[in-house]
Design a protein with these regions (language model features):
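Alpha-helical scaffold segments
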Residues: 1-162
Length: 162
């Protein structure tokens, strides 16, 4: 059916793009390790938290990318976002519990700010948002993000020629 074909084309496109675009050797090593760990069933929110605590940010990004199927560029973007909304959606799509999400959010905020404290109101706000997000809706949003801009354009070009 069309959805299966779209999914297969998307996976092939993303694999090819990922191999050509990630040139940073540290990130390549992190992606390789994340794939191996995923294959062994060792990636989870606790592991992500430990990556951040140990300041292994590239491994965190690679592992989260592997867990949710999003490109590392989208993960990096979600980490740079001050409000944390994208990160909340990604974590909710993985059904990460509230306390673990709050911890991950704070660790990311600290890594961005050099360890400075985060405003309590922002933390309360993002945790409240996290509570309001339904797992099903988060999965739909992540699925939409997985179909990145270049893939959507390629599919549009293919449909225009048929």
């Amino acid at each position: 059916d069309d959805v299966v074909i779209d999914d297969l084309l998307e996976m092939a496109t993303k694999t090819a793009l990922r191999q050509h675009e990630v040139t940073d050797s540290v990130m390549l090593a992190a992606l390789k390790l994340a794939r191996e760990m995923a294959g062994a069933g060792e990636l989870d929110a606790f592991f992500l938290q430990n990556c951040l605590r140990q300041e292994k940010v590239n491994l965190f990004v690679a592992s989260l990318s592997e867990m949710c199927g999003l490109d590392v560029k989208i993960i990096w973007r979600s980490m740079r976002e001050r409000t944390g909304e994208s990160l909340a959606i990604i974590m909710k799509s993985l059904d990460v519990d509230r306390d673990r999400f709050a911890s991950l959010f704070l660790l990311i905020a600290q890594s961005r700010s050099g360890g400075r404290a985060r405003a309590t109101s922002l933390v309360k706000s993002i945790v409240s948002l996290y509570d309001d997000i339904k797992v099903k809706n988060a999965k739909v949003a992540v699925r939409h993000w997985q179909r990145d801009f270049r893939y959507q354009n390629a599919m549009s070009d293919i449909k225009d020629t048929t």
